[in-house]
């Protein structure tokens, strides 16, 4: 049988440039330091915009109504609601999936491994809450006790990434585990303390959405698009209950499978067979143009999708949207505090600002370091390999970068008091910026010490190798 091989064609130069640019952009979007910088830039723009001559346009934009109509039914809410209560659900979905992965195979997969980050996280919640309450023990200021207890994963890890590879990998893993536990605690705080009176009829709607998700998983539906509608039902149900609807993201994230679904033919086998069929088809075809068979192409797409666990696949798809669209948009919509509009003398608002900032700068690092030291001192835990006390200090400082999550909790705590909300946001911005700068400064010292210790070990080993 005669085999026909079509001659390779040179790709157009424009296509080559486009492919290289896309590959560069894709690598760029997965650099954690870049996402932190984008988040910081969005917050800075919001702050400048809200205090400029165009401040009216800033507030008018976020209060502009956005509605959805279906027949005679209309659901209208300001743009601010759609960002904070709808888009942020995707952020919490990513958080839920990160928690699910860590419980399955990461730093939270066994208690012995998770004990020290868990204790550090608890210390990093209790200490700042107590420091805040020391400044603000009376209502309504006391409602903000949870504001400085949170850690912004993206911002904290982004700052750590700026320090480069001199920082041991286990420091990053410890910080991630601590921040994830912090997020779990923050979600529980939102659910129990900031959800208001609950209308239990909404739980039936949320339960229906969860049942549909379980049913789709049971029959082996792998495409993420099939879960959009039941996810929306869960979100609507939680909104009806009075609980914060973004918790739907956490629920769905924790339900996302961490292993590939079972198939009659394994993805690699399907991919190999479909590739052989396509190769045979191309060899059998003359140079004349004709469409490739659709079945092997469809099987290749399915195999490519199913070779990864759903939690990894969805997380990878969500990451650029969450890091470069949703979180910066949240910062842009919420970090714009009008300095003229905040009267720090009214109602003790200056104590709210001081309490939040002081709790993030002092309480968060102190709680993380003290609890870690206590458990190691008692012999209940050991520091992870490669992590020294200098690394724990760095983790404690970066845990004080509350930013996104702290602003989110502040908006729930002071929903009815714009002045105290503004003061709390100022405290979050000042505290987060201060701990980030302190973390960078200490991280540079810590990295230099590690390099010096490594060089000393290398010098000490050199004479030994010469004598051997």
Swiss-Prot record:
The chain crosses the membrane at residues 28-48, 79-99, 115-135, 143-163, 173-193, 196-216, 219-239, 240-260, 317-337, 356-376, 392-412, 426-446. It catalyses: Na(+)(in) + 2 H(+)(out) = Na(+)(out) + 2 H(+)(in). Keywords: Antiport, Cell inner membrane, Cell membrane, Ion transport, Membrane, Sodium, Sodium transport, Transmembrane, Transmembrane helix, Transport. It is a multi-pass membrane protein. It comes from the Bacteria. It is found in: Cell inner membrane. Gene3D superfamilies: Na+/H+ antiporter like domain. One of its GO terms (cellular component) is plasma membrane. One of its GO terms (molecular function) is sodium:proton antiporter activity. InterPro entries: Na/H_antiporter_dom_sf, NhaA. GO terms for biological process: regulation of pH. Na(+)/H(+) antiporter that extrudes sodium in exchange for external protons. Belongs to the NhaA Na(+)/H(+) (TC 2.A.33) antiporter family. This is Na(+)/H(+) antiporter NhaA. It comes from Bordetella petrii (strain ATCC BAA-461 / DSM 12804 / CCUG 43448).
